C-alpha cells in the first residue's frame, strides 16, 4: 500500500482544483514561501492553468497543508517565471523555493515559459496583441 504524505503534489493538485474557475484544470503547480526563516511568513500554492496563474494562501496544519483563499490571480498569457538563487520569480514578485518542491518548481517555470512563448508566437503569426 502506498501512503502519500499529507502535503504531496497530488493532494495539493486535488485541493487546488476547488479554487479554479469551472472550466480550468491544473497544468502545473508548486509550493513556496515568502519567509527566509522556517515557520514565519506565509506559504503559497502557486497553480498554473490553461489561462491563469493562481497564488493561493496555504496554512500548515499538522503534517499537511490547508488551502485558504486566492491571494492573487493573473493571466498566464502575459506572465513571466524564472528560478534564481533559491527563489522563484513570478512576474515581479519572488517567493522562496522549498527544497522538497524543486522538481515541481522547475516544471511550473517550464510550463509558464512555454505558455508565454506559444502566446508570443500566436501574436506574431496573427498580428494580434
Question: Would you name each region that the model predicts?
Answer:
Residues 16, 28, 51, 105-108:
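Generic intrinsically disordered, low-complexity segments enriched for polar/acidic and small residues
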Residues 22, 31-87, 92-101:
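Phosphoinositide-binding peripheral membrane targeting modules
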Amino acid at each position: 500500500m502506498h501512503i502519500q504524505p499529507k502535503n504531496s503534489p497530488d493532494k495539493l493538485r486535488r485541493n487546488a482544483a476547488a479554487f479554479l474557475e469551472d472550466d480550468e484544470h491544473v497544468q502545473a503547480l508548486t509550493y513556496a514561501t515568502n519567509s527566509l526563516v522556517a515557520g514565519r511568513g506565509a506559504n503559497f500554492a502557486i497553480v498554473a492553468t490553461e489561462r491563469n496563474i493562481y497564488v493561493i494562501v496555504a496554512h500548515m496544519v499538522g503534517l499537511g497543508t490547508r488551502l485558504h483563499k486566492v491571494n492573487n490571480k493573473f493571466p498566464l498569457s502575459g506572465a513571466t517565471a524564472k528560478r534564481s538563487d533559491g527563489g522563484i520569480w513570478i512576474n515581479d514578485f519572488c517567493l522562496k523555493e522549498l527544497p522538497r518542491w524543486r522538481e515541481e518548481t522547475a516544471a511550473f517555470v517550464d510550463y509558464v515559459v512555454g505558455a508565454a512563448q506559444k502566446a508570443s508566437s500566436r501574436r506574431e503569426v496573427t498580428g494580434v496583441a
